[in-house]
Amino acid sequence: MEKLTTLTGVGVPLRRSNVDTDQIIPAVFLKRVTKSGFDDALFYAWRRDPNFVLNKPEYAGKGQILVAGPEFGIGSSREHAVWALHDYGFRVVIAPSFADIFYGNTAKNGVLAAIMPQESVELLWKLLEEEPGREMTVSLETRTVTCGDVTLPFEVNDYVRWRLMNGYDDIDLTLQHEDDIAAYEKMRAEKFPFKPKTIPAKHWAEERIESAREPEDADWTGPLADRGII
């Protein structure tokens, strides 16, 4: 995973609160099993509106820092929401608050979820809207956001900050213990050389299954038989 320490890029003001994961990426796009190719699906319904912020020439395909309202990422726990943001180009999302599961998914996929007071977010919205296409700088080292002459602090979990600055995803963290894992697997193979076995289904004797529709007396007739049901 690519390291993230300092990022300078175009800030996008998204004046919306309670943005849920279905608005970030509709469920119809969740059938894909790769983490790429979701950029066109990001905010799919909203982007049908020609006046949506990402359709404006100052932001289209250029945004790297998204500034949104509170409770960003609520709803179902689809990791695709973060994949779509990252695939579009966003490495940072700034908001007063985030849904817990969404917040956890951001760190695993190289996206910073920076928590900032509502008044600070509103100030950033004002600055970005005054000069569309304006660049901002986000520093994980100092935990600050700079936009023009304004520098504001943000909150980030220490563990999340450490992961992002080192570029560690879950696989990277696991590989740090590769020697211990290999030693355990070697010990396990030596101590428990056998492997559990199951009898394949084809070795079982065939057994006829009685149909629930077959009457015990083949000569029996009745209302159902008269109607041709049995």
Swiss-Prot record:
GO molecular function, one term: 3-isopropylmalate dehydratase activity
Gene Ontology process terms (BP): L-leucine biosynthetic process
GO cellular component: a single term: 3-isopropylmalate dehydratase complex
Pathway participation: Amino-acid biosynthesis; L-leucine biosynthesis; L-leucine from 3-methyl-2-oxobutanoate: step 2/4
Keyword set, alphabetical order: Amino-acid biosynthesis, Branched-chain amino acid biosynthesis, Leucine biosynthesis, Lyase
One Pfam family it belongs to: Aconitase_C
Reactions it catalyzes: (2R,3S)-3-isopropylmalate = (2S)-2-isopropylmalate
Annotated CDD domains: IPMI_Swivel
Principal EC category: lyase
Subunit note: Heterodimer of LeuC and LeuD.
HAMAP family documented for this protein: LeuD_type1
Function summary: Catalyzes the isomerization between 2-isopropylmalate and 3-isopropylmalate, via the formation of 2-isopropylmaleate.
Protein name listed in UniProt: 3-isopropylmalate dehydratase small subunit
Gene designation per UniProt: leuD
